[in-house]
Every structure is written in structure tokens, then in C-alpha cells.
């Protein structure tokens, strides 16, 4: 619950979002020309923000199935619940003028959830809590690297 509130705070009130509310202009983007992730040649604030947008939502891949045990039987139930919640939050950002409805954000947030869920599933397979946490962290790292490589390939050769 606390983590969810923290994410909502960042989505609505950080990064000078209150300055955006003054304009009373709906901001939205329903299209994407690329996956907003890449392998950096040089680390920049934009890249950190983009990768942070993935990793910030990875914990929901653990929190949703753990909080609602009925959701943990498959990937699709918690994924659908997360997807609906992210769409709702993106819409709220737009209608409150504290952000924008951005399809790329939904895509990247959902990738983060999926990474978290896959890592959680792998970490649960061991009996030791310590080993489970290590496996979880290793999978988060590994899957994030794989995601960056895939996004770079798709952006460069397929889009």
C-alpha cells in the first residue's frame, strides 16, 4: 500500500507536475514510433528516467499476486488488474492536468510489471528466503538487460 502511494505521488506531484496544471491543457499521446528504451552509448538523465520507469513498476509484479492470492495462480489476472490500474492512472494524470496520457508509459510500466512477475515466480521456487531474494534480484537484472537488448533491436531494425 505504501509503495503504491509513493508511485502515485511521483506520477502526480513530482517532476514539476503542479506547474503543468496551470495550463489546463489535456496532454495525450496515443501512438508510439518506438519502444522508449535503448542501450545507452552514454548514460543520461533521460535514460535513467526511462529505465526507472520500468523498474519502478516491477514491484507490482510481486505485490499484486502476493496481496491478492487469487490473482497469483496465473500471469493474466494480475496483469489485467495492473493494466487497468495503469490506464486509470494515466487517464487521471490527463484529466487533472498533472501529466499526460501516454501509451509509451503504459507499455513501459507493463514491461516493468512483467519483469517483476517473472522474477517473483522464479524466486518463489526455492525454500530459502535469502536465496529467493537473490534469485529475484538476479532475474530483475537479467530480464531488464534482455528487455533493453530486445528494445534496441526492435527500434533499430523493425521500426
Segments and roles (model prediction):
Residues 1-97, 103, 117-159:
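Bulky hydrophobic segments
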Residues 99-100, 108:
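Short capping loops/turns at secondary-structure boundaries
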Residues 108-117:
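Alpha-helical transmembrane segments and their membrane-interface exit regions
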Amino acid at each position: 500500500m505504501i509503495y503504491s502511494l509513493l508511485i502515485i505521488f511521483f506520477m502526480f506531484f513530482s517532476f514539476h507536475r503542479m506547474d503543468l496544471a496551470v495550463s489546463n491543457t489535456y496532454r495525450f499521446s496515443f501512438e508510439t514510433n518506438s519502444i522508449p528504451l535503448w542501450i545507452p552509448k552514454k548514460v543520461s538523465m533521460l535514460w535513467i528516467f526511462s529505465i526507472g520507469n520500468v523498474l519502478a513498476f516491477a514491484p507490482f509484479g510481486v505485490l499484486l499476486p502476493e496481496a491478492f492470492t487469487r490473482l497469483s495462480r496465473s500471469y493474466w489476472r494480475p496483469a489485467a488488474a495492473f493494466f487497468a490500474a495503469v490506464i486509470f492512472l494515466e487517464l487521471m494524470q490527463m484529466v487533472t492536468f498533472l501529466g499526460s496520457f501516454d501509451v509509451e508509459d503504459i507499455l513501459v510500466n507493463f514491461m516493468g510489471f512483467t519483469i517483476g512477475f517473472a522474477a517473483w515466480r522464479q524466486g518463489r521456487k526455492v525454500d530459502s528466503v535469502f536465496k529467493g531474494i537473490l534469485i529475484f534480484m538476479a532475474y530483475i537484472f537479467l530480464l531488464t538487460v534482455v528487455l533493453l537488448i530486445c528494445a534496441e533491436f526492435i527500434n533499430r531494425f523493425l521500426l
